[in-house]
A protein has these predicted regions:
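Cytosolic regulatory regions of ion transport systems
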Residues: 1-204
């Protein structure tokens, strides 16, 4: 569950300062595939579930992209197919620092951690203000927070299915103005839901 994942993450963060920095930063070669002079239009953070649908859409559209995921089995499989990928937790500052986002047009995070997504938004806004940013939240309150931080769209999996997310990303990629329209409509909808107490309970 998302609660357990956050609990495990807090434990790791609390002990990481006692670990050898080289152990944290090192990424075994079989847990990444990074061709030389790699440039990617899309950065996909999180491959499972919604991320898989987005991945399929990017492949079909023949977009250049990089996948980041915390599941070593997924990264081994992608690396074996020579699909650009990195193993790691996007909440790890070292992973964020490795990313060159200057030419990235679109960043999609399917990781429903509000703090991680705030850091992602902050980094992208600093390095590449023109990039479109889609992030994920578990509840309406966090979604509205992420909009305030500058997200172009916040995915709420309980309200929006994976296929619709992929279709929206594809539409925005073709016409960036559609992101602004979708964002304003979504914020209005979320505020209405919040007033009616349609908030989805947190996973436990």
């Amino acid at each position: 569950t998302s609660y357990l994942m956050k609990f495990e993450k807090r434990i790791f963060n609390s002990i990481s300062k006692y670990l050898n920095p080289l152990d944290i930063a090192a990424t075994p070669e079989h847990l990444q595939y990074l061709p030389e002079e790699l440039e990617y239009d899309f950065l996909l953070i999180g491959y499972d579930r919604i991320g898989y649908g987005i991945f399929r859409m990017l492949e079909k559209a023949k977009k250049s992209f990089l996948v980041i995921d915390f599941n070593p089995d997924i990264i081994r499989r992608l690396a074996g197919k020579k699909i650009p990928c990195i193993y790691g937790d996007i909440g790890d500052e070292e992973i964020l620092e490795r990313l060159d986002l200057c030419k990235t047009e679109f960043v999609v995070s399917t990781v429903p951690d509000v703090d991680d997504n705030k850091r992602i938004i902050k980094k992208i806004k600093k390095e590449n203000p023109k990039a479109r940013i889609f992030v994920t939240a578990s509840v309406i309150e966090e979604a509205l927070e992420l909009y305030k931080e500058g997200a172009d769209y916040v995915i709420l999996p309980h309200f929006l299915g994976g296929e619709r997310v992929s279709s929206l990303i594809e539409a925005v990629d073709k016409d960036p103005k559609k992101a602004d329209i979708a964002k304003l409509a979504h914020i209005h909808d979320l505020r209405s839901r919040a007033e009616l107490e349609h908030e989805h309970p947190r996973d436990v």
